[in-house]
Amino acid sequence: MSKLSHSEVLNTIRNGLIASCQPVDDGPMDKPEIVAAMAQASLIGGAAGLRIEGVDNLKATRPTVKAPIIAIVKRDLPDSPVRITPFLQDIDDLAAAGADIIAVDGTDRVRPVTIEAALKRIHELGCLAMADCSTLAEGLYCQQLGFDIVGSTMSGYTGGEVPNEPDYQLVKDLKAAGCFVMAEGRYNSPQLAKTAIEIGADCVTVGSALTRLEHIVGWFADEIKTAKV
């Protein structure tokens, strides 16, 4: 955990960019020391905070940065579609490794641990709690429970075709309801991230467009293939 108070953490990330340093799974950059380097480079570039996946990656990154860290663990479970920090042990491990904010799946889906129990554990361990939601109803429920941050993270990722554009309406609606809003999900250009802040997001998380080199190179390579010469 950084030496910032909860209010200082929120003030630090307010109106700022959160760099999600999550390499492609099992790719050449999926190593804790590389994640830590990505995190440091992101802060040099102007990020206000970081989102780090995995306890080992968090352990490698925390000693190298003072900025707020949102931490998660991703798992693929046989009996639940929930992937983001599904177990209380994950929360315990992230808190011990230095997370300032712990994010959990906030969707209304079958899960091994209730949202209420996850929130209680996060706060007991002295961390701020973030809910990764997909709908306004989910976000409002998590706000009422006492989550400190509500994200649009899961919008478009709970079934069906994934949209191309971010869910601006969800960001607007969450803000209108009084949430501290993290815009997240498909904000893959500077203009889209800027728009998120302009429509009311308190901060915006960008991942693939910053730290997944395979994706970024692919965007360029695919576009070049369509060039008419």
UniProtKB/Swiss-Prot annotation:
Keywords of this entry: Carbohydrate metabolism, Isomerase
Pfam families: NanE (PF04131)
CDD domains attached to this UniProt entry: NanE
Pathway(s) this gene product operates in, as recorded in its UniProt entry: Amino-sugar metabolism; N-acetylneuraminate degradation; D-fructose 6-phosphate from N-acetylneuraminate: step 3/5
Catalytic activity reported: an N-acyl-D-glucosamine 6-phosphate = an N-acyl-D-mannosamine 6-phosphate
Example of a GO MF term: N-acylglucosamine-6-phosphate 2-epimerase activity
PANTHER family: N-ACETYLMANNOSAMINE-6-PHOSPHATE 2-EPIMERASE-RELATED
Family: Belongs to the NanE family.
Protein name: Putative N-acetylmannosamine-6-phosphate 2-epimerase
Source organism per UniProt: Actinobacillus pleuropneumoniae serotype 5b (strain L20)
